[in-house]
């Protein structure tokens, strides 16, 4: 019997893998590299109605921080009155893509009709286990105000009764389940705001697909003992690889999933050993996949990758950015028999939208109704460092913010976490040193110059649940000697640091100073506070930085340090967020 995928030819006589026959847009020149395509003039491919190369221009890096550069469109098209009311134009920088009204409306209808996991087409064993995982990882969900998961009390069943799918989980699971087991290639883009539960939005369909394949594939009894990789989740950083793997690995005991994390600390020997026992879900980076072709220990890596049926590319706007697209695209080309490709992103920059639609013309978009919106429950507070009493000292303004956070009586008895973002990585140690030496804070400084092991060690305390404090703060500062002050040219009233700041030194704060290297995807559990020491350069950076707090509809506080020359769009951010308007 002819294999199902034989009608999707890949290899030509010259050995070049042709993806055009499966909906991918690629060069027809056998042996030509994607790099040459990047530099060449695009040729129209009339058969596939797309360009024959990834649409990425050679742009100079902005050189700021550790983050990848993003596109900055100069489009000045005048928006309609309705668009003006629904979209916030972010200064002079390139706009994020506006969501398709039809797609957003369809998502709203689905969310209004489906409010329980039992209404979604998921295998019962998969649904129950993944709901348990969600419960164990949820700190506070808007539907769980009165019930908190406590593993020691084993109240997961009670917790699950109150657990509801997030809007993007509802939409993504519903849309993918309709054709989950259809044999043709299916390419989808899952787009939703930060902290909306996107990991589970792609993980549930992935696991459901694997378990259904085991049930429906007659040859599974033979395949299950083969050295194969069945699915891969790709991420841009090893911090995200670690985070996603911690979730995926919880599926092993109950569902019999063989999971594997292939990061910077993994050896090729370890990969080979894991492969012998079958890998159901591998979490890694594009670079690690491509490295398979450079070692002799792994025989015919193309055969291994040809067994992959389900691919997830998380933080897709980064992985298809100019700096990553060559590796990411090459990685996908080696997976010849894919059934599902899921791209996942919290932001859809216009350049990314052009790239993905040209590389994958058949891509279907699944978007949250709240795409490109900052959680309206977040409090956005502007602090003008040029005004008295700071007189141009951003460090003093930052110290006052941290003092205010320490005294705000939110989550009493628990350690508080604050993440501070700066634009330049050179400023990270400077800011951290001042906070530690002058104000006695427990500060961690992290940049891309740190090794993977160092970064993972530094962020671990911020990813674990908040610690309960066993000692009380000093009582030296009392209501009688505390001074309340209004910050000039801001919308916040805080307490002034007293001259005797011994109580201030005994802080329960844990502070992380970093750049945009940690602005994407990282789930800082229990982090209610984000400080933007510098104004973000792009709307993408703004959305991702602010998205480190207020996750899963929790409340968070964001402090933005500004100056006299602050632009009007910065002043408008608090109003835009409170009105729940999309940022474009």
Swiss-Prot record:
SMART domains given for it?
DEXDc, HELICc
- Whether Transferase counts among this entry's keywords is no
Q: What is its EC number?
A: 3.6.4.13
Motif window: DEAD box? 314-317
Q: Define the transit peptide region by residue numbers.
A: 1-49
Question: So what does this one do?
Answer: ATP-binding RNA helicase involved in mitochondrial RNA metabolism. Required for maintenance of mitochondrial DNA.
Can you name this protein?
A: ATP-dependent RNA helicase MRH4, mitochondrial
Give the organism the record lists: Kluyveromyces lactis (strain ATCC 8585 / CBS 2359 / DSM 70799 / NBRC 1267 / NRRL Y-1140 / WM37)
């Amino acid at each position: 019997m002819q294999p199902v995928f034989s009608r999707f030819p890949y290899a030509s006589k010259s050995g070049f893998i042709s993806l055009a026959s499966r909906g991918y847009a690629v060069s027809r020149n056998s042996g030509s590299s994607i790099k040459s395509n990047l530099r060449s003039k695009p040729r129209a491919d009339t058969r596939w109605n797309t360009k024959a190369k990834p649409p990425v221009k050679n742009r100079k890096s902005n050189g700021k921080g550790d983050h990848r550069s993003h596109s900055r469109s100069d489009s000045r098209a005048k928006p309609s009155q309705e668009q003006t009311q629904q979209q916030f134009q972010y200064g002079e920088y390139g706009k994020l893509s506006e969501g398709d009204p039809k797609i957003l409306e369809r998502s709203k209808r689905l969310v209004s009709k489906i409010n329980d996991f039992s209404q979604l087409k998921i295998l019962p064993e998969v649904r129950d286990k993944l709901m348990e995982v969600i419960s164990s990882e949820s700190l506070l969900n808007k539907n769980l105000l009165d019930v908190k998961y406590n593993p020691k009390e084993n109240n997961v069943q009670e917790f699950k009764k109150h657990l509801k799918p997030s809007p993007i989980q509802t939409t993504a699971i519903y849309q993918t389940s309709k054709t989950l087991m259809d044999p043709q290639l299916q390419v989808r883009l899952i787009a939703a705001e930060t902290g909306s539960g996107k990991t589970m939005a792609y993980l549930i369909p992935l696991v459901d697909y694997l378990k259904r394949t085991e049930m429906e594939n007659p040859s599974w009894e033979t395949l299950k003992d083969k050295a194969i990789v069945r699915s891969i989740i790709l991420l841009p950083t090893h911090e995200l690889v670690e985070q996603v793997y911690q979730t995926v690995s919880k599926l092993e005991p109950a569902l019999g999933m063989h999971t594997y994390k292939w990061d910077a600390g993994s050896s090729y020997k370890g990969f080979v050993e894991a492969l012998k026992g079958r890998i159901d879900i591998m979490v890694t980076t594009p670079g690690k996949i491509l490295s398979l072709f450079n070692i002799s220990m792994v025989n015919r890596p193309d055969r291994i990758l040809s067994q992959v049926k389900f691919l997830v590319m998380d933080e897709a706007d980064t992985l298809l950015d100019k700096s990553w697209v060559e590796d990411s695209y090459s990685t996908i080309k080696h997976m010849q028999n894919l059934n599902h490709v899921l791209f996942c992103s919290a932001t859809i920059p216009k350049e990314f939208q052009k790239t993905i639609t040209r590389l994958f013309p058949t891509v279907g978009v699944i978007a949250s109704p709240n795409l490109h919106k900052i959680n309206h429950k977040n409090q956005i507070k502007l602090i003008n460092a040029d005004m008295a009493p700071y007189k141009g000292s951003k460090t003093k303004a930052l110290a006052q913010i941290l003092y205010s956070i320490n005294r705000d009586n939110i989550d009493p008895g628990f350690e508080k976490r604050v993440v501070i973002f700066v634009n330049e990585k050179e400023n990270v140690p400077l800011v951290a040193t001042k906070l530690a030496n002058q104000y006695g804070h427990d500060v961690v400084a992290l940049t891309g110059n740190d090794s993977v092991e160092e970064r993972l060690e530094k962020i671990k305390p911020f990813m674990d649940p908040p610690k309960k404090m066993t000692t009380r703060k000093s009582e030296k500062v009392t209501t009688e000697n505390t001074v309340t002050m209004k910050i000039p040219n801001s919308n916040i009233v805080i307490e002034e640091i007293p001259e005797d700041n011994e109580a201030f030194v005994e802080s329960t704060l844990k502070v992380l100073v970093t750049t945009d290297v940690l602005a994407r995807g990282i789930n800082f559990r229990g982090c209610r506070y984000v400080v933007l020491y510098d104004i973000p350069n792009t709307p993408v950076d703004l959305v991702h930085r602010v998205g480190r707090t207020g996750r899963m509809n929790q409340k968070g506080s964001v402090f933005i340090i500004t100056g006299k020359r602050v632009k009007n769009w910065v002043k408008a951010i608090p109003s835009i967020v409170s009105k729940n308007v999309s940022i474009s």
